[in-house]
Amino acid sequence: MTSLASSSQLPGSCRTLPGEGTQVHPRAPLLQILKVAGAQEEVFTLKEVMHYLGQYIMMKQLYDKQRQHIVHCHDDPLGELLEVGSFSVKNPSPVYEMLKRNLVILNNSDAAKNLSVGKDSNESPSEDPGQVSSGSINSAQPLIAGSSSTGTTQSCSQRRPRDPDEDSSDGLPRSACKRPKLDVTLEEWDLSGLPWWFLGNLRSNYTRRSNGSTDIHTNQLSPGQDEDTAIVSDTTDDLWFLNEAESEQVSVEIKEAVLEQGSDGESPHEDEDTGKDSKDDGKMQEEQEEDSQCLSDDTDTEISTQDAWQCSECRKFNTPLQRYCMRCWALRKDWYKDCPRLVHSISVPDIPACSSRPERDEDEEEEDDDGIDMPDCLRTVSDPVVLPSHRVSRNIPSSSASSSKGKGPSQIHHHFQETSEGDSQDTLDMETEYQPEALLEPCKLCRVRPRNGNIIHGRTAHLITCFPCARKLHKFHAPCPGCGQVIQKVIKTFIA
């Protein structure tokens, strides 16, 4: 650094970077600490002082293993210099004060150097490790300077609260002196420093970047922070392990939200077999996506918009696969409504004994030999005769008059048995005709969608819910609403 005889040479001194050619001599206590860290000389640059301080803290393992930004030095010579038992890297003011007291600048022949160094020390710490060390160490120079630099340092301290955009006494802006310091990046340092602090605060250092820079904030670094931090300036792809815990928290929150949403759809017994639930949930999520794609009514490529039918009540267009309007639940007009119902037929063949019974009764009336009727074939109770109701109704009136004339009670009982069996068959037909009407009712759970979700358990199934509700029941391992059995599979049924 050149000597300064007048104030006109101040800009040149301000542009001198800290740590470049500035030789400092530590006092005896600090020098002893630096030699323990591996220093062999007695004159250092600012970078070398910071390097050996970091090596000393690493060698003695003074940092806290859990909270790595805290350094404990109460039983160490470093603590005697700092006059504190412990300090945090986030608040390195004790280190600044120690460096002011224990560093002496060499080759300090005039007041210009003291002025430039004093201006550097009065500024607040900047956003890289170089500025931490240089700003803190140079602040000690006004304390050890000669009396000739007193006036200039006072003028520099008076200009401290001024805005950076204001001009200094020589006509140049103050930012001209600060700009070289802001350009000092991690690439100018060697591969050494405080890796324990860097690794512990790597996440916060990168998340606080708004301009994409990988430089580390000063208020998060120790004064021993030096060259080793440059090794990660271009290794942003290796930071995957830092976001692993956050991704696990997000997945847990998503799973909890899905469980809360499913619990609103009447799904009891959700806590059964929790060990299998975690494995089945992943499979069910994939199956749900596949089901929604292959079982959706809109995935049929052969059905076009021209085939859609319009509801006569609410004027909504529906797909031709649905016979009910999805909005008002009205039946589609002319949906097989006028077609006659088929008569339920019975596969039992006609029995000639019943059809020929009236003729035989007339023949037996003409005969006066036997007064007791003995029918040839009387069926037992275990093998009943089931005939259509209309045939029984025709046979009974024609034979009622003749059978009442002198016939035994067995034949009369037989006719009444046939009549009762015909009535029971009529009730059976009515029940079978009523069962399809139950399918017209909406879902038992949501009361909105049609019953198209077939819940299968074993060799039986129940069609009492819609397909979305049935999938929710299967997903959350709820029993069948109809019988309480375990749901094995859910399929979508198209009723036409």
UniProtKB/Swiss-Prot annotation:
PROSITE patterns named among the record's database cross-references: SWIB_MDM2 (PS51925), ZF_RANBP2_1 (PS01358), ZF_RANBP2_2 (PS50199)
Zinc finger (RING-type): 443-484
Record-linked InterPro entries: MDM2_MDM4_MUL1 (IPR051652), MDM4 (IPR015458), p53_neg-reg_MDM_2/4 (IPR016495), SWIB_MDM2_dom_sf (IPR036885), SWIB_MDM2_domain (IPR003121), Znf_RanBP2 (IPR001876), Znf_RanBP2_sf (IPR036443), Znf_RING/FYVE/PHD (IPR013083)
Motif mapping: Nuclear localization signal: 448-451
GO CC term, one of those recorded: nucleus
Region (Disordered): 1-21, 115-177, 210-229, 259-302, 350-428
Composition skew (Basic and acidic residues), residue ranges: 275-286
Residue spans of biased composition, Polar residues class: 1-11, 131-141, 210-223
TM ranges: none
GO biological process, one term: negative regulation of apoptotic process
Zinc finger (RanBP2-type): 305-334
Major location (coarse): nucleus
Keywords: Metal-binding, Nucleus, Zinc, Zinc-finger
Low complexity: compositionally biased ranges: 146-158, 397-410
Subcellular location: Nucleus
Stored Gene3D superfamilies: SWIB/MDM2 domain, Zinc/RING finger domain, C3HC4 (zinc finger), Zn-finger domain of Sec23/24
Residues annotated as domain SWIB/MDM2: 22-105
One Pfam family hit: zf-C3HC4_3
Record text on subunit structure and interactions: Binds to p73. Interacts directly with p53.
Family: Belongs to the MDM2/MDM4 family.
Protein name: Protein Mdm4
